[in-house]
Amino acid sequence: MSPSHSITSGRAAVRLSVRGVVQGVGFRPFVYSLAQRHALTGWVRNTSAGVEILAEGAPADVDAFVEALPREAPPRSHIAAFERSGAEPEGAMAFRILGSAVDPDAYQLVSPDIATCDDCRAELFDPRDRRYQYPFTNCTNCGPRFTIIEDLPYDRERTTMRRFPLCPACRAEYEDPTDRRFHAEPNACPVCGPRVRLVRRAEGGAEDGPGGGVVELAEGKPDDPAAPIGAAAELLRRGEILAVKGLGGFHLACDATDGDVVDRLKERKRRPHKALAVMFADLEQLRAHCRVSCAEEELLASPEHPIVLLPWRDVGPDGAVGPELGGGAGEGETCGPAGGAGPAAVIDPEVATGQRYLGAMLPYTPLHILLLREAGRPLVMTSGNLAEEPIVKGWEEIERLAPIADAYLVHDREIAVCYDDSVGLVRGGRPRLIRRSRGYAPFPVALPRPLPQTLACGAELKNAFCLTRDANAFLSQHIGDLENLETLEHYETSVAVYEKMFRLEPEVVGYDLHPEYLATKFALALPQDEKVAVQHHHAHIAARLVECGREDAVIGVSMDGLGYGDDGRLWGGEVFVCDLLGYRRVAYLEELPLPGGAAAIEKPWRTALGWSYALLGEDGLGRAARLLRSRAAAPVLADEDFAVVRRQIDAGLNAPLTTSCGRLFDAVAALAGVRHEITYEGQVAIELEMRSPAGGEPYPYALEGEVEVAACAPRRGAGEWVAAHAAHAAHAGEAGARETAPAVIRLAPLFAAVLGDLEAGAAAGAVGAGLHATVAAFVLDVCRRVRAATGLSVVAMAGGVFQNRLLADGCEAVLAADGFEVLAAGLVPVNDGGVALGQAAVAGYTSLKRRGELG
């Protein structure tokens, strides 16, 4: 065997190339210290591809160094590749950190932003420390990363910190190998670093920038860097709404215990019912309002610090949160004692109207830590934007917040990339993300195999895009709903940033079938010749497969609001047999009309009435109308409202057919009187879930037709058995798959039973419990039949409907009890935020197939 290093005059040398997340996480200082410990000389440097090391010394010391390096690497690093080769000793007298080597064609992984570490937090409150109450304290273990990086390699001159030259004290730390700020690129202090200011808009607006168009209320200075934060806390205590510039953009903040200001914020933000997130000073304060399991505490306090959905704690009659709802189901035993809270500390229930769960987070920057400490109460901390617009990140955009904010807590560190807060929960002891953004992106998802460079443009709602290089899928941060120019511009800018950062020139473009999606139009306007249309629900399942590292065929259960089908109709309750190349539709929910199209989504009473009529005729129409009237909130429904729905269905005018499971929940919830009109996506279904206990009895349904897919049973090689999709039609013929009509889940028995229960006086929660159990029952029924026909026993569940904890838990439980392996949601959102990952995989695999490279 050849030696793993070169030996000259008794000295050995080795060259190491390390790829992965190895910049911005203290990797070079770690290598330096490790080399010192093993008495080695040489050097370490950043490159455009990662970190390069040359180490020389006694052969045994070199070997020990190489062995220890991956084992002891910094906790926030991630080594994706570690290459070792021999080298000639250079005779270096010391070990040094060299300047970066820039290769314009190379790329590397980039660290997401990291929440403030314990050491920096301790300094923040130590009056003897020179960073006492400094809002931008950070070190190699924490602080801003991706949101300040403008290019790679990761050096200060290629970040937004370049405009803040280091003072002598910070420079000494930066150059001291024994200091934890050794080569910490965002390093700063009150003397040389960014400063915070509290301002109000003057008459004439903020368009003149931070030096004009504003009234100065307080300014941070070297001897009192946190003065504006104390003044801001006083405004919050007085009931004002503040725009607070944070890590990846602005938050809108107010006192979460003041119902008047909470209502005012919701009104100004045009968000009357959707829940707001709350930031707590610490776990003790949080425990006074929520029940928290140990797994949830771990997620809250993780380096990512996401918003975590937690069940309310009973805070007594005066502060009760929805007396009908009570506390939500907890995730295991609570961790730690309940915190104390006097009456003034009770969070206003309208923060999360009608919800069992509160979106809670802990402060993750020094600025937030200081603000929460000064405020002395929990603060609403919601995205700094108007409803459906991207988050504001800079002063040049702050005019958009003028209708909402009374004052602005700002700073002069620029934000390179706009990032919203991530949102997650814990189910089954595992973190599950609903929104993947700060703290998680741009860390890549590993692909089962390398793919051609691919851009996947994502969905219309909850958009994120995805770019691939090698076996890395860079799923972007949450972009938002692509329904206005501002969000589209944010989307286009973010795509360009990722392409630049990861040195990408996509060869393949994946996009949704829906011709009117802005993401689809963006894709079709791109110059690339190789474009792949990917069916929405197939993309959902493909995302689950990629996250779980699977290529083989599975049973895919994809249920959501709406997605464009191969037949041009609106799908949303689908069961596939599929892999990463293609799929076959084997069952779906019965097609039913949406009277008024989009109006039926905004006014779910229309769906309730239309489906009752379509399924049960005149009798169903009359019974549904009486229920809707008897349980109606404002506005009261008139005879003409019902007549219009009937005419639309009879004539087939503006009543597109859909198989949507999301609309099924809407219809039943509206019949049960939960809500007849919505102000945000999925509202009525979410509120039905909140009222529904576990353990309901299934309603009847009918499964019409046989699941006959034996002829397309999986064979060796990804995609060799798939049919259905037009893009794979020729290949389907090669596989010998015969066309069979999918089975249909008929809903007339369910609607008849629901109407009967409601007429007998059943509560909405009881009916909701039955509906959840019914969906779990027919999912199991169909999966059993597919297993019997194909032998497949792995089920991938995806789609926005599975954000519903009660439904997801129910489906996973019955499937697991019947011997199925379930690929459930994880750190890739189960909703449309994960669609781009699936699109990227399907488009990339399709490209490999076309090239004859898919083995």
Regions found by a protein language model. Give the residues of each.
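Intrinsically disordered, low-complexity, mixed-charge
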Residues: M1-R197, L815
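A contiguous, well-structured pocket-lining segment that forms one wall/lid of small-molecule binding clefts
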Residues: G193-R195, A459-E489, T493-V497, Y613-S793, ...
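Conserved phosphate/anionic-ligand binding catalytic regions in large, soluble enzymes, centered on
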Residues: I241-A256, L379-P390, D560-L570, G652-R675, ...
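Conserved phosphate-binding/catalytic loops in two-lobed NTP-binding clefts
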Residues: D512, Q528-H540, S793-V795, C811-V835
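Glycine-rich phosphate-binding loops at beta-strand->alpha-helix junctions
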Residues: D512-Y517, V794-G810
